[in-house]
Amino acid sequence: MNIKIIGVGKVKEKYFKAGIAEYAKRMERYAKFEIVEVPDEKAPETLSQAEMDAVMAKEGERILAKIKDREYVYALAIKGKERSSEEFAKEINQLATYGHSDITFVIGGSLGLSPAVLKRANTQISFGRFTLPHKLMRLVLAEQIYRAFTIINGLPYHK
């Protein structure tokens, strides 16, 4: 199985990088894990709706360029469906059972994801109504993916 997280912007903080690297290492026995960073669009603090739409569209084009047709895509979105860790693990296991060996998760920038990315996504997932920095979300997502694999394999990590 191939797992990819596409995120807008670069993670610079060593502590986030270290956490993500730890879960990437733990996942090696279950899947090939990859983080893809696409550049964020520079924008001033105050934007009109049209300017926000343009920023999201440009970031969306960069994201879509990194997604292959065969990939099953999860978009992380506030309006996405919330799942428990157990439900998420069951879903990942079912995807593998039905032949989806390439699973991609997309985390947008500060303005969110473009309509084009949301349309391309096979499903939208939410980690709740909290607003989290997208860099932190990469770490949280990596941990949840690892947790899903431990649940699938009956390991004691998930309690």
UniProtKB/Swiss-Prot annotation:
It catalyses: pseudouridine(1915) in 23S rRNA + S-adenosyl-L-methionine = N(3)-methylpseudouridine(1915) in 23S rRNA + S-adenosyl-L-homocysteine + H(+). GO terms for molecular function: rRNA (pseudouridine-N3-)-methyltransferase activity. Its EC number is 2.1.1.177. GO terms for cellular component: cytoplasm. The keyword NAD does not apply. S-adenosyl-L-methionine binds at L76, G108. Keywords: Cytoplasm, Methyltransferase, rRNA processing, S-adenosyl-L-methionine, Transferase. Gene3D superfamilies: 3.40.1280.10. The keyword Transport does not apply. Belongs to the RNA methyltransferase RlmH family. Specifically methylates the pseudouridine at position 1915 (m3Psi1915) in 23S rRNA. This is Ribosomal RNA large subunit methyltransferase H. It comes from Limosilactobacillus fermentum (strain NBRC 3956 / LMG 18251).
